[in-house]
């Protein structure tokens, strides 16, 4: 099989694998395994795209099923692994999350589906894979595959509109103002940009400090932010670097050293969801294992110590 044929499909395969697993590391492993199977001398392929999509989907289903126990024993909230790219979107990973169904909030919703529902929904609704092929991936009937996708669709639409709704065209403007206000310590502007029902959700698996439970409501989120400033210092938000997080404006930071009596802050990625011109969700990913798809990926191998969670 020609390498060029496979490389022409790599972006598509990464897009499928990432949506199925929610992690860049797993997606890369899956695409590599698909290449090894493609490169086998015994492999005869009539339709490379369909064949490779099926292989990637089956591997993704296996990953989801094997990950179920790990996620049950995970410390705190499990969030998808974000894809962080430059503002010019020239990073090859930017194309993997270019579509709206890969926005961070959309990936969070996918985490709430059963593995078979997720596969059926992603393949059919996301990539227009016929139900006959979806059924082949799942080892079930076409009718059962349709039912799985239907149930997944209902589960997705049943999620709060603030999370499952369409991306807000004012996203970049709102996030830019929020980050500037945070860096300047302008709490009045910060409050004005938060939706009354805003949530702050942390994910570190106990490896770095973050919220132990989701913080809900603008008043509580503002108090939480004030607590962060008291802990890490007034330069906390000035350390953020704007970037695209799953195709939408967000931020990341390599962390801060502990100086002048303030504590050191671990590296983290901030994904932000905007609806109706207001910030309705802040996602704080501080687990270094989830930095694979970001400029912080070198930090994965560096020990961070067991993090003490912020109380909320």
Swiss-Prot record:
Key word DNA-binding present: yes
An example Gene Ontology molecular-function term: sigma factor activity
Expression induction: Undetectable expression in log phase, 18-fold induced by 30 days, decreasing slightly after (at protein level). Up-regulated 2.4-fold 7 days after infection of human macrophages.
Pfam families: Sigma70_r2, Sigma70_r4_2, SnoaL_2
Single Gene Ontology BP annotation: DNA-templated transcription initiation
Keywords, in A-Z order: DNA-binding, Sigma factor, Stress response, Transcription, Transcription regulation
Subunit and interaction comment: Interacts transiently with the RNA polymerase catalytic core formed by RpoA, RpoB, RpoC and RpoZ (2 alpha, 1 beta, 1 beta' and 1 omega subunit) to form the RNA polymerase holoenzyme that can initiate transcription.
Identification of the protein by name: ECF RNA polymerase sigma factor SigJ
Upper classification of the organism: Bacteria, Bacillati, Actinomycetota, Actinomycetes, Mycobacteriales
Gene name, Swiss-Prot/TrEMBL: sigJ
């Amino acid at each position: 099989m020609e390498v060029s044929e496979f490389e022409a499909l790599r972006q598509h395969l990464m897009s499928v694998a990432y949506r199925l697993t929610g992690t860049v590391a797993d997606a890369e492993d899956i695409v590599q395994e698909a290449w090894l199977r493609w490169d086998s001398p015994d492999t005869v392929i009539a339709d490379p795209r369909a064949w490779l999509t099926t292989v990637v989907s089956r591997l993704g289903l296996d990953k989801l099923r094997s990950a179920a126990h790990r996620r049950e024993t995970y410390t705190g909230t499990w969030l998808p692994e974000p894809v962080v790219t430059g503002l010019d979107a020239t990073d090859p990973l930017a194309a993997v999350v270019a579509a709206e169904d890969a926005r961070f909030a959309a990936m969070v919703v996918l985490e709430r589906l059963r593995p078979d529902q997720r596969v059926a929904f992603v393949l059919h609704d996301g990539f227009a894979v016929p139900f006959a092929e979806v059924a082949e991936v799942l080892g079930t009937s076409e009718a059962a595959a349709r039912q799985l996708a239907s149930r997944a669709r209902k589960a997705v639409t049943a999620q709060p509109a603030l999370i499952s709704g369409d991306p807000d065209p004012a996203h970049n403007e709102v996030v830019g103002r929020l980050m500037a206000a945070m860096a300047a310590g302008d709490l009045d502007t910060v409050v004005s940009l938060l939706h009354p029902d805003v949530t702050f959700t942390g994910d570190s698996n106990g490896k770095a400090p973050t919220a132990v439970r989701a913080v809900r409501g603008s008043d509580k989120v503002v108090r939480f932010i004030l607590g962060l400033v008291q802990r890490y210092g007034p330069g906390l938000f000035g350390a953020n670097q704007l970037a695209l997080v799953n195709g939408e404006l967000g931020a990341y930071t390599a962390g801060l050293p502990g100086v002048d009596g303030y504590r050191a802050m671990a590296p983290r990625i901030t994904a932000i969801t905007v609806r109706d011109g207001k910030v309705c969700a802040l996602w704080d990913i501080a687990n270094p294992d989830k930095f694979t798809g970001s400029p912080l990926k070198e930090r994965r191998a560096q020990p961070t110590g067991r993090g003490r969670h912020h109380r909320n």
